[in-house]
Amino acid sequence: MDRLLACLLGFLLIASVGSHAARTPEQYWKSALPNSPIPSSLSQLLSTAGGGTSVNVGGGGVHVDAGHGKPGGTTVDVGKGGVGVNVKPGYGKPGGTTVGVGKGGVGVNVKPGYGKPGGTSVGVGKGGVGVNVQPGYGKPGGTTVGVGKGGVGVNVQPGYGKPGGTTVGVGKGGVGVNVKPRGKPVHVNVAPFIYNYAATETQLHDDPNVALFFLEKDLHPGKTMAVHFTATTAGEKFLPRSEADAMPFSSEKVPEILSRFSVKPGSVEAAEMAQTLRDCEAPPAQGERKACATSLESMVDFATSSLGTSHVRAASTVVGKEGSPEQEYTVTAVKRAAAGGDQDQLVACHAEPYAYAVFACHLTRATRAYAVSMAGRDGTGVEAVAVCHADTAGWNPKHVAFQVLKVKPGTVPVCHFLPQDHVVWTRSG
């Protein structure tokens, strides 16, 4: 009987451990934070069931579900049904392809047998997207793609078989990528929310996050600010903690990491991933506690351990209309977003470009978090999260905030709005 009881206890223990290990990131969140809803900025990064590939850009801007390794059964939706692509199973070439945008905004029909895109033309709405591929170009020479009013512009100079001379712009500078001809290094701007770094000239002129910085004295109803609210990454999915913890994550392992994810060395993506690793390995600023969360579970653990309680709230900026351009917003309401005294402690987690979801999280002291309601000139409503840093003495004197706001470290509180895919954690009570 004793042996039977021991076997039963052992079986139950193994089952319990197995059940714990098999919990999804969402289940872990609900277990650790039963009274805290998960923000949409994080829930959209959770992997979908069924093994199908899913890609999200921005706040649902592009959604791709590929049920098969070949184009049979592929479905692509942009926005709320903005673009629908259905490729009939069994066609190895683009025969039978149909693309519909909005209410017939774009219709593309490629007849079977055309192996090259000679003369192909795609137009969306009133010039929303224009693609013109000149006949005879087997490579991307002469290709031009424009989305919205400059929403995305891609220009590939003729004769470059590789990404030499490629320029990509999203929104009005939402994402800027400049790839120089072969043999030249790829430049990637440093993250503006890592305060040890000095700003580069390129960042000062081209990074839309620069406009997110402002002074606390300007945070009041009636104030007008020119802001472009965007997501800063392509929305890669979270890996479960067990998978993320098994992945190499070090600057010393860059070649192995790139190989594992089939990322070409020397590409923009490779440079961004290497910069993310450097960001994660950089020492904390004075009075800061930092870590990179490579899974949703590790983000929850860092936030709760840093704030010393499981009674926490996670919040992100929510924009009422996707794809809103840079415009003037008027502040309509401001309220404190955290419980506590005059000087709050909070954890901010900033999305970093990587092969899967990675967030640079840091605990900051002498900070205040605000929930800010804003109305855009075009009527777009925004519920923004703003963070104000009362002590900036330990920041790099050439940080982008000081150069844009024309102030010196440690003199006045410096504030910034959060991009849509960043998260702030505060105590809830």
From Swiss-Prot:
Residues 213-428 form the BURP domain. The keyword Signal applies. It holds the Pfam family BURP. Residues 1-21 form the signal peptide. Residues 59-81 are annotated as: Disordered. InterPro entries: BURP, BURP_dom. The keyword Nucleotide-binding does not apply. Expressed in stems, leaves, shoot, panicles and stamen. Keywords: Signal. PANTHER family: BURP DOMAIN PROTEIN RD22, BURP DOMAIN PROTEIN USPL1-LIKE. This is BURP domain-containing protein 3. It comes from Oryza sativa subsp. japonica.
